[in-house]
Amino acid sequence: MTTTDPHYATYIAGLPKVLAGAACLFRDAEGRVLLVEPNYREGWALPGGTVESEAGEGPRQGARRETLEEIGLDIAPGRLLAVDWVRGAGRPPIVAYLYDGGVLTPEQLAAIRLQEEELLSWKLVTRDDLPVHLLGRLAGRVRAALDVLESGAGTVELEDGKPVA
């Protein structure tokens, strides 16, 4: 079957759907994690969002674009820390890519400008306080990414925020 085959569109439409999301894990010099507070759901999040794959965007590009949109910083994502297969109720699964955003300087932190249409506030949170702010699987993803940074290990594969054995 080729892309010019009349049945190709039907074939593609029948394939399983998967969404993609991408975020950056930013820290300060003390190792605290930068979180943002969305106005459209409970809990806190990392700067990031949906990858605009239909527009040809890849996960790394999506993480950079979302960081610029949400906190006003144009920072190239560093290495890939975690990939998480996130099952959902009432939506297709999401493949969530989490990149190292690096350590922000005091000047970069002072330059943060929130996307007011989506975000209420931001704050820096210690690793121990992450479970208080992050709901469910995101907390596991962030902890796993911090472990990768601490150990120097390679990218961690997760399912629903838990390492795959």
Q: How does the language model describe each region?
A:
Residues 1-23:
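Acidic, metal-coordinating catalytic segment for phosphate/diphosphate chemistry
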Residues 45-49:
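A short gly/proline-enriched turn/hairpin at secondary-structure junctions
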Residues 51-76, 84-138, 164:
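Unchanged
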